Amino acid sequence: MANKWVYLFSEGNANMRELLGGKGANLAEMTGLGLPVPQGFTITTEACTQYYEDGREINEEIQGQINEYIVKMEEITGKKFGDKENPLLVSVRSGARASMPGMMDTILNLGLNETVVEAIAAKSGNARWAWDCYRRFIQMYSDVVMEVGKKYFEELIDKMKADRGVQQDVELTADDLKELASQFKAEYKEKIGEDFPDDPKEQLMGAIKAVFRSWDNPRANVYRRDNDIPYSWGTAVNVQSMAFGNMGDDCGTGVAFTRDPATGEKHLMGEFLKNAQGEDVVAGVRTPMPIAQMEQEFPEAFEEFVKVCKTLEDHYRDMQDMEFTVENRKLYMLQTRNGKRTAQAALKIACDLVDEGMRTEEEAVAMIDPRNLDTLLHPQFDAAALKAATPVAKALGASPGAACGKIVFTAEDAETWNARGEKVVLVRLETSPEDITGMKASQGILTVRGGMTSHAAVVARGMGTCCVSGCGDIVMDEANKKFTLAGKEYHEGDFISIDGSTGNIYDGIIPTVDATIAGEFGRIMGWADKFRTLKVRTNADTPADAKKARELGAEGIGLCRTEHMFFEEDRIAAFREMICSDTVEEREEALEKILPYQQGDFEALYEALEGCPVTIRFLDPPLHEFVPTEEDDIKKLAEAQGKSVEEIKGIIQGLHEFNPMMGHRGLRLAVTYPEIAKMQTKAVIRAAINVQKKHSDWTVKPEIMIPLSCDSKELKYVKDIVVATADAEIAAAGVELEYQVGTMIEIPRAALTADEIAKQADFFCFGTNDLTQMTYGFSRDDAGKFLDAYYDAKIFENDPFAKLDQVGVGKLMEMAIKLGKPVNPNLHVGICGEHGGDPSSVEFCHKIGLDYVSCSPFRVP
């Protein structure tokens, strides 16, 4: 049987997301619910994949089915493609399985040409509307299909408005729009070198190809990488008969949410534009009116819309984001989807849905996107400083949080300034999908145009970046990189502060502070604790970090890097002495100076953890990282050691390694300098004894982690030193104290021989940063130079240092667990690389049987 590449809306349902994409599946579901949906068909995601397999061509079989379904659509609507009497006009939209806002653009009014425009103008008696549709279609088709930039057309519109002395597009007459259409066609011919296509079927195939092609455009690739959307999914294409919101003042278009996407409050929220088409609202070209005003303008359509909202929210049991059009006072639903929301709103909505009996606690936890929880810990303005400040303007608070930075006017500048360590606020007329990387590099985004559903607002909310949109008081001069607001001129590099929760804009610097956690957060985390089996620890080297992580729910420290403690002023001198010593005795003497500091550090950590486990990794970096590089520091060290500057330079030179990542580091240091491991063991055990004495109700049980082992004999050698030293300390103190000695699995050989290593270890902890480096043979610091080329060539979809490679590195981890646990049934296993905070990596760790993950404090929730 031939493949089915095309489905009518009436042939699908919400469970067919993989095939029909999110938009197509939801249009089918709304059709099934009997809602007023302009009919059409969906070309499947498989057709997109096939398009790429066929060398970016739509093959004859797929084209044949599309033509077949155009005929079916003509039968359903009673209109004909390209017909003078009763022409069928359609919209063409992309729709991947996962929503990708602003990534794939829409084409409206497809099927128009000069003949059809004249016909619909005569038939409707509304020439202005007909020519408005045509000029929009030429502009969208040129931009989306042929990739002629929007700006050329916007400039022609702005010039026309200036010539006619009007402010708004809606003030242009039918003749003005007719003239614009011919100017647009001339622009098209100049840029493309051929006439604008008149044949509706040629237009349609061009548009479908453009949607497929846009699946692989740079901004889609960036968005997919950031949101774990596989390239292999492809996008569906939805071809839908047009409903017109721009036929006159009894028409309009809008976007609405069944709950507030910024706060989660249960009330209808959205925006509506009279005499406009859908893209006008989403693109933020005109600033719309609130949805409540629609009730005065179109009472019957509004009443029906409120009922539809309730039907959809009850059906999907989640907050819905809907697009709709009113044509001659009749309502048409164009799409629905689970609405994107801020992290605060996500928590409130999930809790409210449980309270309303629509969701279980377990379902509510599953509704929360873990990546969004980062944004809950958003900076806010310092309360005292905020009280003293007066806003210079107020616009729409489109994405919460507070931002303060230097003004930049382009996405490129935002990236450049951010790369050199400057905090920036990106100020734009409106953002477009090309600005995504610049938006990521900014502390906050401020736009002149656009509402709560504009591109800037939607993308900023998704990224957790503060955004204020629709500040019409700004008089922008992009060419000269300046704007005027409240009588003051602002230039590139001037400071500005914006509040994405209130929409307030402030002149100058207002300091920000970290956020605190609100009540719903606690409820959701409590439910999550009920259902989870994986423990969560934190990577922390200081008591302050440990305290913060405990507040956020960490159940212990999974990685304390002791080397960070050596860099403090009072210790580094002694440590350098140790490095430059000639004898064991001299080294021990220098280490003796560091011992009380290390012990104090560990005591403070145990205090902060209140009896929760603390895993202390012994010295890992190569010694060359600790020696001085400045001439003055070298002189000081020479004087302290009673050596010449030349001798010290000779020692430093001797520490130089060609490949330090694989050099003299980790437990190799303990093999060559056992006295370092002895000193660290004494500090760990003495600190534990002291804190245990002070708090008899706590169980202080240190976990000593030996890094970088690759052989069981090597691990045994160092473990024996640690155990002998620890047991001697415990005996001398006359106390009982349990402790564990484990190792990091960060070399492939350690994973391959984990059965042998498990005989010597109480626990394994995967150091996935190094394990990834060693498995791939990539240096983490240098991989950035070539990874972009790997993404472009579709060799990799993700940075393996950000998202765990489950196929290679993951296989080694699974192997280590399967080999280690039978040999040592009490072996507990964790992960402490950066991957410990990445949601998809954590899911994998759970699947292969890890006991805990450890991540930075702010990623604990």
Name these PLM-found stretches:
Residues 238, 408, 425-427, 446, ...:
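Structural motif
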Residues 93-94, 517, 527-860:
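Conserved alpha/beta-domain cores
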